[in-house]
């Protein structure tokens, strides 16, 4: 019976336990077998008994007052699942441990992976900026002889289209098309890096990059990039 109940458990994130009688031992055996979080809604003494039974053995268990309470808390569990399946592409200038731009951030990135399962891939900010260009991908300053992810003529067609759509859809735009395009190029280039590094989140030390004057040279900031990423469901921030 336990084997039958456990079928497809690899596709399940959370099991809700319901008792027709009081087979507490079966519920415990099932939870130990599948290794997945379990929960129960208000079920008289069963809620307290099952909670004690599971938690005493280090099993993840939730006891909810009602379905409304359960539904609300499951948003937290969904967020945890997303974080576990996420990989951050972090552009760094000097150190990946402490951000000069955000000293209030976490000081040990390994703790993110340890606690949430989120992985981090690092890329040199200078390599990234080199490749947000239409230059020869084999001639980038930081990686000479190694083919980069530089923008292509085909990419530019898409970038031009996105630039025009962005301007046309704006309630107000005080930037020239040329300047808007530079920020769209940055976003497009960063998304190429996200694909190449199989990442779904992005961060860069924006103020620290401003201090290098590379962004001044490139004539864009990360602001629009972060906004466009966020609109597409890609967490992105300084």
What label would you give each PLM region?
Residues 1-238:
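An N-terminal assembly and electron-transfer interface module characteristic of large anaerobic redox
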